[in-house]
Every structure is written in C-alpha cells, then in structure tokens.
Amino acid sequence: MSEQYDFERAWLAKFASCLDEITGKEIRKEVMKGSEELTSHSSRQDVIGWSQRAMERLDILVDGTRRREIMTSCACQYPKSELRDIREEYATTGDLDLAHRMLQNQFELFLKNSLGFGDELVEETVKRGWGTAGIKKGNTILATKIPKSGYLIEYVSETDPEIKRQYYCHCPRVREILKTSKTISPTYCYCGAGFYKGIWEEILQKPV
C-alpha cells in the first residue's frame, strides 16, 4: 500500500472527524456520503461536485454556529514552528501588540524573501490589510486573506472581477469552480477563515 500523502483523503478525514465531534455520527454519515472513492487523483469535477452536495446537506442539517465551527476546524494550518518565537514572547510578556508586530514582520519578510516582492508591492499589500497578521484595532484583529501568492501581482493588475476571483482563491480542492458558472455554498469558505483562527490560537494558547 502506498504511503504517499493524499491531501484529499486527509481533508475528508478531518472534515468527518469534525462532523463526528460537533454533530454526531448520523449527520456525519449523511454529509459524507459519496466521498468514499475520492482521492487526490480524482478529477476536480468530481471533488467539486461532491463538495457542493456535501455543503448543501450541511446547510440543511446543521445550524450556522456549528457549521462555522466545523469548517474552520478543517483549515490548512500555519506551521507551528514558525510561530514558536511569537508564542513564547507572548507567553512571557502578555503583549498582544508585540505579538502582532512580530507576525506582521514575519509576513513582510515572506513577501520579500520568498515571493520576491519589491517595497512598493509590499506596501500595497500591507495597506490593503492582506496577510497573516491582519489589522489590529483594540482587541480585535481583522485578517483579510491575501490573494493566492503565486497570482498576487496578476490580481493587483487585473481589472476583470471574474478573473480576479479566480486569482484570489487558495483552495486546491474547489478553486477551479471559479472558472465556471457554478457556485458552492459560502459555508465552505469558513475553512479558509480557520487558517487565521489557528494562527492566533497557537500564539495565545487559547480558543479565539
């Protein structure tokens, strides 16, 4: 049996586990039906079609609060190793402003060193409030997901709103839907919100 990592099976297992924990076995079985054969080798059409139907079932069977809890728990996670220094500094000082500045500095270095952004594009990105750290106002942090990093330059220069939407989405499971006239329930996109939730829960070491 191949031990190669299968992103699709891993995501589905996480989704099923969250459904079990938050809604119970019966709803989990109903929402997950039809997913048994999906793998990373499945066509995007099959993955997207199943995801649309699963979200429709989830929207019918589960209230909004629990839907958000389920989907945010399915998110891809920021590497904990890259948050260690920030977490330790916050544990020592309790200074949220300092933790936020450290995360922002880390994000700007990523833009420059990993993506090769010049100062002007970094400034434009920060001005829009995009990225890991977000904008801190009092005790609230408003984080707006950056367009998919490989397309950020194209996103900024593009004027067609439909093409901009295609550039924006990060999700490898369903982003191809944006090239079609089809839609998926907004419930699904809470998965992306969980990315930021996970960052701050790791730094603060408590639920947010």
Where are these predicted regions, by residue range?
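N-terminal accessory segment detector
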Residues: 1-184
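Short, thiol/selenol-centered motifs that function as redox-active sites or metal-ligating centers
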Residues: 185-194
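Amphipathic alpha-helical segments that form well-ordered structural scaffolds
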Residues: 194-203
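Low-complexity, intrinsically disordered Gly/Pro/Thr-rich segments
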Residues: 204-208
